[in-house]
Amino acid sequence: MQAKLTKNEFIEWLKTSEGKQFNVDLWYGFQCFDYANAGWKVLFGLLLKGLGAKDIPFANNFDGLATVYQNTPDFLAQPGDMVVFGSNYGAGYGHVAWVIEATLDYIIVYEQNWLGGGWTDGIEQPGWGWEKVTRRQHAYDFPMWFIRPNFKSETAPRSVQSPTQAPKKETAKPQPKAVELKIIKDVVKGYDLPKRGSNPKGIVIHNDAGSKGATAEAYRNGLVNAPLSRLEAGIAHSYVSGNTVWQALDESQVGWHTANQIGNKYYYGIEVCQSMGADNATFLKNEQATFQECARLLKKWGLPANRNTIRLHNEFTSTSCPHRSSVLHTGFDPVTRGLLPEDKRLQLKDYFIKQIRAYMDGKIPVATVSNESSASSNTVKPVASAWKRNKYGTYYMEESARFTNGNQPITVRKVGPFLSCPVGYQFQPGGYCDYTEVMLQDGHVWVGYTWEGQRYYLPIRTWNGSAPPNQILGDLWGEIS
């Protein structure tokens, strides 16, 4: 059952009640319980049960009418909440009031009989006292309960493109397809590298340190007839750019791509081309084609994609390779900062593995970059009218509304809308924030808000990675008002 009033309408009623007196049951003057009942009657036409105020959360069935929250250190009350104080108030009967404002440190309420002046004449029925509904500030306490009515819905002015709107249903439309790779097998002729005698144990992904012109075709032209002296400087099994894969060595051959006997003999080497000269968009496409080729080969060999089968050049020797991928996906530049730390190495490997597994499952993954990297251009790009896109690949739009969390905690992030960003705090069930920005990033819809001078980023539903306005969204994790 929905309330007869919207939240804003009820808050206006609370404001008009200040200075008045309420004796709903016509007993013992103007009790705090009477004021709670007056508000409940305005909302639902019903009266609350309970011998004292402290009994309200337990003596009533709030199913469909309201949600009851027990106070926690991180709970944030909302205007319109009924707050119930425990038996350490009101001579054991508790106390009840209506919240009009709240922070994490205190609540401001309208209440009746806080000072005990609601019944002073000694006459039981109806009774009289001098105390009236008063606005007052209180600290949170334990135990304390907050009862949030199911208010009549209000229409919030939001863009039709906003991801806080109802989920866009996926309709029958062409699904994205993987790029059709053009695989050119043209084995080098200047030297017949030895055979391994078995399938590779996995794949080593390299960055070629090549210029913008160092495409797969360019490597083919330069190496396919190169002499042994040139091949000894290094030759991988495949070179990838755009949708082109040049296979320079047979799968059965060893390569000279890791400067390490184990890496050369047992692992198939793939170079992601143009890693020094291409723009980020081009290089990321080259990476995706590489992941697609890795998926094809692993399936062919009957191997899974994991940390044993997907390797990095820097696991075999001290090198900055794969330098460009490291910067884009971990934010760490091994060229300027030294060898890639182990945690960053695992972060990069796991990203590669996740992308490759998606291709192995017939899916089309979305390339993501670290919020610490300067991916794409340094300018904000307009996208799909209401949306813009920043240098980190984040789609964003201005929107002012209130998000109220549902029944599960949500991890809030600082710095930016990425799951890899530092944790701010746990956004508790029933908590709310007044946000000013909506973003699409890292598989989620995020809202941005400022609290006590700190900017926070809160994911509120999933996002399938499609660019707006064609995004497909999961269920909202709370309510927007």
UniProtKB/Swiss-Prot annotation:
The N-acetylmuramoyl-L-alanine amidase domain covers 198-323
Residues annotated as signal peptide: none
Whether Transport counts among this entry's keywords is no
Single GO MF annotation:
N-acetylmuramoyl-L-alanine amidase activity
Report the record's Gene Ontology biological process terms.
cell wall organization; defense response to bacterium; killing of cells of another organism; peptidoglycan catabolic process
Please tell me whether the keyword Methyltransferase is annotated for this protein. Answer: no
Catalytic activity line of the entry: Hydrolyzes the link between N-acetylmuramoyl residues and L-amino acid residues in certain cell-wall glycopeptides
Enzyme Commission no:
3.5.1.28
**Where in this chain does the record put each SH3b domain?**
398-466
Instruction: Please name the SMART domains in this protein's record.
Output: Ami_2, SH3b
Reading the lineage from the top rank, the first entry is Bacteria
Question: Which InterPro entries is this protein grouped with?
Answer: Amidase/PGRP_sf, Amidase_domain, CHAP_dom, Papain-like_cys_pep_sf, SH3-like_bac-type
Keywords (A to Z) from UniProt: Antimicrobial, Bacteriolytic enzyme, Cell wall biogenesis/degradation, Hydrolase
**Taking every annotated instance into account, which residue ranges of this chain make up the domain Peptidase C51?**
7-148
Q: Where is this region: Disordered?
A: 155-177
Main enzyme class: hydrolase
Specify residue ranges for compositional bias: Polar residues: 155-165
Q: Which family does it belong to?
A: Belongs to the N-acetylmuramoyl-L-alanine amidase 2 family.
Function as written in the Swiss-Prot or TrEMBL entry: Has weak lytic activity toward S.aureus cells.
Protein name (database record): Probable autolysin LytO
